[in-house]
Amino acid sequence: MSKLKVCLRHISEVFLYEYYCLGDDEYEISDEDTLTPHKEKAKEQLLAGNYSGAQQEWLSAHLENPVDMETILGIILCCKQLGDADGEYSYSTESYNYCCTRAELAAYYRNLGWYYLEKYKPEVSAACYLYSKYFGESQQADAELEFLEKAVGKKVAKKDLPQIQKILKDNQIPTEANPVTLALLYKAAEEAAEGRDKDQALDCYRMVYDLTADKEIGKRIESLESR
C-alpha cells in the first residue's frame, strides 16, 4: 500500500498530524513544499473575489497539510462568504484541535459566534464573541457583536466570565485549550530539545506558555534561550 505524502515543516505539525489525522495509515513527508503554492493561489483568488476558487485551493492545501491553521481558517472564511454554515461549523470544530496560540483560540470562538448567529442562537453567539475577547482583543469581534445587536434589535447583555463559560458549557463548547494538544506540543518540545533543535523546541514551549502561562514552561524557555 502506498504511503500518504504530506507537507509538514515543523515538529509540532508532525505530532498533531500523527495523533489527530494519521490513523492506521503510513506516511512520508514530501521533500518539496507542496503547501505554499496552493495557499498563494487561494489568496490570489480571494483578492479577486472568487471565493469558490479560493476555497478549492484552500482545500487542496488542506490535503497537503491537514493541521495547518492558516489553511483551515481560509476554508472557514470561504464557507462564510459562500453561506455554508454547516461547512463553517465542521471546519471550526476541527480547528479546535490545532489551536496552538491564544490568537488561534480567539479565532475559534469568533467562528463559532458566526455559526450560532446564523442558526438563530444569539445568546450562544454573543457568549462566543465575548469569550474570544478574553484570548485577544479584536476589532472583528467588536464588529460582529455590533452586527448581532442590530440583528436582534437589542444590546448584548453584560455577563461575567463564569456566566459566559456556563453558556458555552451548556452548549458543549470547550472553555480552554485542548489538553491533548497541549500535551502533544509539550512532547514535541521535549523531543526537539533532545535532538538539539533549539528553535523548534522554543517554538513549541512558547505555544504551550502562550496558552497556559505555566511558570515551569517559562523557566524552560528561559533556560533554552540562555544556551
Kindly give the residue locations of the regions a language model identified.
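Start-of-helix register in tetratricopeptide repeats
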Residues: 36, 70, 104-107, 140, ...
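Alpha-helical segment of the N-proximal tetratricopeptide repeat
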Residues: 30-64, 184-195, 200
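Short coil turns that delineate tetratricopeptide repeat
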Residues: 66, 100-103, 136-137, 179, ...
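Register position in tetratricopeptide repeats
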Residues: 47-48, 81, 118-119, 150-151, ...
